[in-house]
């Protein structure tokens, strides 16, 4: 685990990112964005019901504190669109920015319900909550909402405007299903339910020095080491 937690797109790295987002605000329609006045104005035009005048002061406080916002499914999409949360946490409370690429890492722009349907269409395992596997990084959902299971009976979720990104006890919420996310690498985790097949998950990219290489290891870091050794002659 200590090795995988440093590798973007593994379930351990994804969970660590979600936990570091605790305390950040919920902005409807946002996908891990820096809180700015320009963003607030744009979202207010898109979703006026969620950006009424009674909420403006809170939104502007988030902006002043240079926070990072998302909605429930936006937390999941944003992790992928920012290349595994690259630069996101470091930007909180500072003037730093980070890059986000729409649809990156094979993560489509889906709603909370749409993401569940998409995962099932990709052959991901899923089931009702009475079959919840002890696999951190899987999604939890009920109609119109999604969160991330972090293990030990707890989840991280962008719960809503009045809550922001919070850690909640799974048993205290009304989750109906769990499901495997097709763009997260769950390693050797065993799933049952649904298609119960391992989807075509993008391979985790390792950079040289982030893991111990062994005979049979594959990846970009192996190629980098081979090239380095060739240069040495």
Segments and roles (model prediction):
Residues 172-203:
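Low-complexity, Gly/Ser/Thr/Pro-rich intrinsically disordered linker/tail segments
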Residues 2-15, 62-66, 70, 77, ...:
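...with weaker cross-activation on analogous glycine-rich loops/strands in unrelated enzymes
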Residues 214-233:
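A short amphipathic alpha-helical interaction element
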Residues 1-90, 143-145, 156-158, 188, ...:
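N-terminal capping segments
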């Amino acid at each position: 685990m200590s090795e995988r937690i440093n590798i973007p797109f593994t379930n351990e790295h994804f969970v660590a990112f979600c936990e570091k987002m605790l305390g950040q605000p919920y902005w409807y329609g946002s996908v891990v964005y820096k809180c700015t006045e320009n963003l607030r104005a744009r979202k207010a035009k898109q979703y006026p019901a969620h950006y009424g005048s009674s909420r403006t002061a809170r939104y502007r406080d988030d902006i002043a504190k240079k926070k990072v916002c998302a909605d429930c499914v936006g937390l999941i999409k944003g992790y992928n669109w920012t290349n595994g949360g690259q630069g996101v946490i470091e930007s909180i409370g500072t003037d730093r920015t980070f890059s986000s690429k729409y649809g990156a890492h094979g993560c489509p722009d889906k709603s909370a319900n749409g993401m569940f349907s998409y995962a099932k269409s990709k052959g991901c395992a899923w089931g009702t909550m009475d079959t919840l596997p002890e696999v951190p990084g899987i999604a939890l959902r009920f109609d119109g909402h999604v969160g991330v299971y972090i293990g030990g009976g707890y989840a991280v979720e962008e719960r809503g405007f009045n809550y922001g990104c919070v850690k909640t006890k799974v048993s205290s919420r009304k989750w109906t299903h769990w499901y495997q996310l097709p763009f997260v690498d769950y390693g050797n985790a065993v799933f049952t339910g649904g298609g119960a097949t391992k989807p075509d998950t993008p391979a985790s990219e390792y950079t040289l020095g982030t893991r111990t290489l062994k005979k049979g290891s594959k990846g970009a870091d192996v190629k980098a080491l081979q090239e380095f050794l060739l240069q040495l002659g």
